[in-house]
A protein has these predicted regions:
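Fold-level recognition of mixed alpha/beta catalytic cores in primary-metabolism enzymes, strongest
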Residues: 113, 118-119, 123-228, 237, ...
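Metal-dependent amide/peptide-bond hydrolase catalytic core
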Residues: 1-9, 193-415
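A short, acidic/glycine-rich surface segment
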Residues: 93-95, 158-160, 182-185, 231-234, ...
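A short linear hydrophobic-aromatic micro-motif
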Residues: 57-61, 184, 354-357
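Acidic/His- and Gly-rich active-site-bordering loop/insert found
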Residues: 2-114, 137-142
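A structural signal for isolated positions on well-ordered beta-strands in alpha/beta enzyme cores
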Residues: 60, 85, 147-149, 308
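Short acidic loop-to-helix transition motifs that present clustered carboxylates
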Residues: 65-69, 157, 181-182, 363-364
């Protein structure tokens, strides 16, 4: 619903005039063309580092792990003002089948930009960059710094954002441009945690199957118990579907390398990969205790039931290696109110969702690390969609609006 609102000031108009929608689309398309799956972000980071430097920002490549890089840039203020981070991750979701075109060759149709990675979340990265460049090109004098963090590794625990915070980019506030919609500001979401459960058996030839212990059969019992498990928690009515968990992968075979040949041999090792979403009453420690309690009960019933819990998961598994805490940032925080106010200025509307939006608030993201570091933050980014992870797209009107809102928010924060 439209509401009374103040029009942009002359200074705001000066910044907004430096946002070229064609340039926004070109940058987004360039990013689509650079695949940057989790652990493979470096080529995209290097491209961005060069781009940001060419545009006049103070940019650097940070090596968060050997050979794994991310790009971070700063628009320096004159001093004495508040600093703000505009944050987006460059690692992208796994590629699903079913695409109707080449997923790394962007195309536009019906006001939507298509391409793999654009939704989660290269459109958000684009908005962050173009917002900062609008400020620089406007010539407006800022006292505080504006940081653009194009981080790696959000999809496996967010170690890129942690690295940025701990290596020179701790700001007074932050906006993470996750793709939840240009009229949505999220401040509350679940925590996330990955772990691996192993069951151990004893391999024997099928001719002596009775003498073996089948790790796969034991895992079937374990999965049934895990799915029925009641995780210890205090109910949060704003997140009614939490806690929740998902057994996402199961593999069993011979030995810890899962030799899948020789189906005539009883499996002696089986693993299941589990993701858990939880609220602020829970932690990694409480969840581990719940898993042990549940699996210990199976072991008490069955002397041949042997298990291990792997946490943190080995890096080679590509899972999150941290228990990312749930977040509940007060909507009264200045950065939240700035985004809300600038959305109203540009659209004439209040946000459709403020604080919690379901199911989006059941997802984890890097505001976890910012908030735990004492940095007030919120989620605000351009929305779009996908069908079973193929033909992923972003709504261009949302991308343009978010770019403008972020530019005015950074202007207000760093003025």
């Amino acid at each position: 619903m439209a509401i009374a609102h103040a029009p942009p000031t002359d200074v705001q108009k000066q910044v907004l005039a430096r946002i070229d929608e064609d340039e926004v689309v070109r940058l987004a398309c360039d990013l689509i063309r650079i695949p940057s799956f989790t652990t493979e972000e470096t080529p995209c980071a290097e491209w961005l580092g060069n781009y940001l430097r060419d545009q006049g920002l103070a940019a650097e490549l940070q090596e968060i792990e050997p050979g794994r890089k991310q790009a971070v840039a700063r628009l320096h203020g004159t001093g004495g003002g508040r600093s703000i981070m505009l944050n987006g991750h460059i690692d992208i979701d796994p590629l699903a089948g079913g695409w109707t075109r080449d997923p790394f060759q962007p195309w536009i149709a019906d006001g939507r930009l298509y391409g793999h990675g654009i939704y989660n979340m290269k459109a958000g990265v684009t908005a962050c960059i173009m917002a900062a460049l609008a400020l620089k090109r406007s010539g407006v004098r800022l006292r505080g710094d504006v940081v653009v963090a194009c981080v790696a590794a959000e999809l496996n625990s967010g170690v890129g954002t942690i690295h940025a915070i701990n290596h020179g980019y701790r700001t007074d506030m932050a906006v993470v441009a996750e793709p939840y919609g240009a009229r949505t500001i999220i401040t509350k979401h679940t925590g996330t945690m990955d772990l691996v459960v192993h069951t151990l058996g004893r391999a024997t030839h099928i001719s002596k199957k009775e003498q073996g212990v089948d790790a796969i059969s034991k895992m079937m019992r374990a999965i049934a118990a895990i799915n029925a498990m009641k995780l210890t928690h205090t109910h949060d009515p704003e997140l009614p579907g939490v806690p929740r968990l998902n057994v996402g992968s199961v593999i069993g075979g011979r030995g810890r390398t899962y030799n899948l040949r020789g189906a005539y041999t009883v499996s002696d090792f089986c693993s299941c990969y589990v993701n858990i979403r939880f609220n602020t009453s829970q932690s990694g420690e409480t969840i581990m205790a719940d898993f042990r309690r549940t699996l210990d009960a199976l072991a008490a019933e069955d002397p041949e039931f042997k298990y291990e819990i792997e946490f943190p998961p080995e890096p080679s598994r590509g899972l999150g290696r941290l228990a990312k805490a749930a977040v509940d940032v007060p909507v009264t925080e200045p950065v939240v109110q700035m985004v809300k106010r600038n959305l109203r200025t540009l659209s004439g509307q209040e946000p459709e969702h403020l604080g919690v939006r379901l199911p989006q608030s059941y997802a984890g993201n890097d505001t976890t690390h910012l908030w735990q570091a004492g940095i007030p933050c919120c989620l605000y980014g351009p929305g779009g969609g996908y069908t079973d992870y193929h033909d992923v797209h972003i709504d261009l009107d949302e991308l343009f609006l978010v770019t403008r809102v972020l530019a005015l928010t950074a202007l207000e924060a760093a003025a």
